[in-house]
Regions:
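A gly/proline- and charged-residue-enriched helix-loop-helix capping module
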Residues: 113-129
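Generic hydrophobic/packing signal
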Residues: 96-102, 125, 129
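Histidine-centered divalent-metal-coordination microenvironment in nucleic-acid enzymes
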Residues: 81-97, 140-155
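Short secondary-structure junctions
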Residues: 67, 71, 127-136
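Acidic/His-rich structured neighborhood in mature extracellular/periplasmic domains
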Residues: 95, 111-114
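Catalytic cores of NTP-dependent nucleotidyl/adenyl transfer enzymes across multiple folds
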Residues: 44, 54-57, 122, 130-131, ...
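N-terminal regions immediately upstream of nucleotidyltransferase
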Residues: 1-89, 100-112
Length: 212
């Protein structure tokens, strides 16, 4: 039995050989990799994002834990965790895990505890960045630096490893998220597809930005 792929061409052209097909796919991959390099963050842009994240996290650690750690009690989410951030830089998304004592303190509030919590986190950041535009609504506190917006999701760690995050809409509530399950799923899909899923996600985002 022939080892050639069963790609049938019009009469007279015969089967498409592996030797013909492979160079075409090599070219596609090379163009894909070059496009990905062209839209990936530059080293300067990447370091700027890292610095902004570290500064915001250090500020919140001082307020809630009495330390100045630039990374403790936080983790990246979104395109920065997925390694799909592209230029031009837009935002850095992160979870900041608050002490459980903060949750119990806000439980004494009668109205929209979640909104009050976001405003407290915003005020803690405003003390360090008084001239920077900020907002706190929905699930995030947004710190709008000139080059990046850092979007902070205040969260509480549950015994299950999941998190509660704020939702200020409709009177306020907590939403349960399972980021680690999502992370494991993305890792599995990426590995099963030759580590191409994350670059494809970045490519898709680049095409989307070019249209809007």
């Amino acid at each position: 039995m022939s080892a050639q792929p069963a790609y049938f061409a019009p009469a007279g052209l015969g089967l498409l050989s592996v030797a013909q097909a492979v160079p075409q796919w090599i070219g596609v991959r090379q163009r894909f990799e070059q496009f990905h390099r062209n839209i990936a963050l530059t080293e300067l842009q990447y370091q700027d994002g890292v610095t902004k994240r570290a500064s915001v996290v250090a500020c919140l650690n001082r307020s809630y834990y009495g330390t100045s750690s630039p990374s403790d009690n936080s983790f990246l989410v979104g395109s920065w965790w997925e390694n799909t951030a592209i230029r031009p830089p837009r935002d850095v998304d992160l979870y900041f895990v608050l002490p459980i004592s903060v949750y119990h303190r806000f439980q004494s509030y009668q109205w929209n505890r979640q909104s009050a919590l976001l405003q407290e986190v915003k005020a803690a950041l405003a003390a360090t960045y008084p001239d920077t535009d900020m907002s706190g609504d929905g699930q995030v506190v947004v710190v709008r630096f000139r080059s990046y917006a850092v979007e902070v999701v205040p969260a509480f760690l549950l015994q299950s490893g999941q998190h509660w995050i704020c939702d200020t809409h409709n009177g306020g509530s907590y939403k349960q998220t399972d980021l680690w399950a999502e992370i494991r799923h993305i890792d599995a899909v990426d590995q099963a597809n030759g580590s191409n899923i994350r670059p494809l996600s970045a490519l898709r985002a680049g095409v989307f930005r070019s249209k809007f």
